[in-house]
Amino acid sequence: MHFSTSTSTIGVVAAVLLAALILLYRAALPKPIHGIPYKKGSEKRLLGDAPDLLKWRNETQEVFSYMRKLAKDLNSPVFQLFMRPMGKPWVVITDFREAYDICTNRREEFDRSAFTGEVFGPIVPNSHIQFATDDLWRSHRQLLRDTMSPMFVASVIGPIIHKSASGLVSLWRTKARLANGQPFDAEQDLARCLVDLIVSSSFGYDVKSLKAHEDSLSQKVVKGPKDVPMEFTAGEDTEACTSLITLASGVGMAIRSPFPKIVLPLALRFLPSFASAQRYTHNMISEQAGAAWNKFSKAVNVSRDEQVTSAMDLLVLREEQMARKEGRESRLDLPVVRDELLAFLFAGQETTGSTIGWSLKYLAMNQDIQKKLREELRAAHKRAAQTPGASPTSQEIVDTHIPYVEAFIAENHRFAVTISCMIRHTIKDAVVLGHVIPKGSDIFCLTNGPSYQSPSAPVDESVRSKSSQAAKDKFGVWDETNVGEFKPERWLEKQPNGELRFNRFAGPSNPFGVGPRACFGIKWADLIIKTMVTQIVWNFDIQETPEDLSGIEASDGASHRAQKTFVRLVALQ
C-alpha cells in the first residue's frame, strides 16, 4: 500500500511538472502582433526567426539583406520577426515615407532603441549617442554644437581632411607604381586615413598612420599575373593606429553578437588587446585635453578662435570663455568630452570608410560615370586643372558645389546603404500603417530595399498617419523601370535656364538617419566624402578589377561594409 501511494504521488508530480513545462513552452513561443504579416511557421518555434536569420548571416555575412528578402517574399511594407523567446516581436518597416515620419514627426511615440546603448554604452558610457532623447541628451548636444558650425568645419576640419586625403593619394601613388597594373587591397589604407583625420580633427593628435605605413613600405615587390592582387610588405602600424582601430572594432563586435550588452565589457576586461587599446586611447586623450587646457587657461585673450586646431580645443576654449564671462573657475568634464569625441571616431571611421570603399567599387564598375565625374571636377576647378601637378585645395573643395559630384555621392549612398537600418523603440502604443504596435517594441526601419532600391510595396494612403499624408509630396518616388540601376542623373533637375541642380529630395535615400536622432557628425562626414572622392578621382584612373576581387557582397557589423575593397589604380599626373 505504501508503494502504491508513492507511485501515485510520483505520477501526480510528474504530471504537474509536464503541464508546467508545456505551459512554460507555450508562454515562451512567439506572440505575433495582430494583423502584421510574418513568416508562417516561425510563430510555432521557440526561437522563432532567429535560426533562419543566423543561418543567412553565416552564409552571407549579412543581416539586413535577410529582412529585405523577407519583405519581398511577404510583399508587405510592414512585417514582424520573432527573435527572442518571451520577447516582443521586432517590427520591420520598409516604406520610406512611414520610416521618415516615425523618425521626424512622431517623437512622442518613438525614441532611440536600447540596442544603441547596449552597443556603445560599454565603450563610450558618457556619450549622448546612447541616451534617451531627454534633457541630458540635449545638454550634451548643446556642448558639441559648435563643432558642427559651418565656419569651424570649413576652416579647421576641412584642412585636416584635405591633408589626410593627400596622404592617401601619396601612398596610393607609390602602391600604384609598385603594383604596375596589379590590383591591391585598399581597405586598411582607408581605415588608416580615417583614423588619421578623425583623431586629428577631434583631439589635435597626429597619428601619422599613413605616413608611417608609406615610410616602411618595402620597394621590393614580387611581380605576379596582372589579375593577382599585389601584396605589399611594410612595418607594423603605430601603437596609436592599432589601439584606435582595435577599440573601434569593438562596436562591430557588439553589433554582431546576440548579447551586445555582455560581449564588449568582457572584451574590455579580459582581452589584453582591448584593455591596452582603451588604456592607450584614454591616456592620449587626457594628454591632449591637458595641452588644450594649458593653451587657453593661460591665454590673455580668449575672444578669438585663431588658436583652435581641433574639436577638443574648441570645447576647452568655449568653457574658458564661459567661465570668464560668469566670473568662475573653468572646469572640464573630461569623461564626457572624451566619450563624445571618441563617438565621432567609432561612428565615423567605420561608416565613412565603408562609404568611400563602396564609391571605389561603383566608380570601377561604371567607367562612364567615373569619366563624367572627372570631367565635371576639372571643369569646376579650373585653377588646379590648369596647373601641372596641382589638385583642388581644401577651401576650393568647400566652396565649389558641383551638381554631378553631389549626385554621384547621393547615388553611392543609396546603393551603399552603409547604415542599413534605423532602429526606434515605442514609448507608448503606436499605430503604424493601420497596425497597433505595443509599447516597448523595437521598430527596424530598413533603408536597403523596397522604395529605396526596388519598387515600393503597396500602401493604402488612408492607413498612413496624418503627418505622413501631409508630407506626401516632400520627396519624389524613384522610377520603377530603373530604380535598381546606379544612375547619378536621377538626382539632377534641369532649371529654366538649362542648368542642372542637385535635388536631395528627388527620391528615397537615408544615409545618415533623419530627425533629432540623425547622425550628429553629418557635416564632417559630408566634407570627408566630398574631399576624398574629389582627390581620388582627380589623381587616379580607377580601373575594373577581376571578377573574383569585385562583387557587391557585404558584411554587416558597425556598418554595411564591402567584403572586398580591391582597387586597380593608374596615377593620372
From Swiss-Prot:
The keyword Transmembrane helix applies. It is a single-pass membrane protein. Pathway: Secondary metabolite biosynthesis. Induction: The expression of the dibenzodioxocinones biosynthesis cluster is positively regulated by the transcription factor dibT. Keywords: Heme, Iron, Membrane, Metal-binding, Monooxygenase, Oxidoreductase, Transmembrane, Transmembrane helix. Heme binds at C519. InterPro entries: Cyt_P450, Cyt_P450_CS, Cyt_P450_E_grp-I, Cyt_P450_sf, Cytochrome_P450_monoxygenase. This is Cytochrome P450 monooxygenase GME11363. Cytochrome P450 monooxygenase; part of the gene cluster that mediates the biosynthesis of dibenzodioxocinones such as pestalotiollide B, a novel class of inhibitors against cholesterol ester transfer protein (CEPT). The biosynthesis initiates from condensation of acetate and malonate units catalyzed by the non-reducing PKS pks8/GME11356. Pks8/GME11356 lacks a thioesterase (TE) domain, which is important to the cyclizing of the third ring of atrochrysone carboxylic acid, and the esterase GME11355 might play the role of TE and catalyzes the cyclization reaction of the C ring. It comes from Pestalotiopsis microspora. Pfam families: p450. The chain crosses the membrane at residues 10-30.
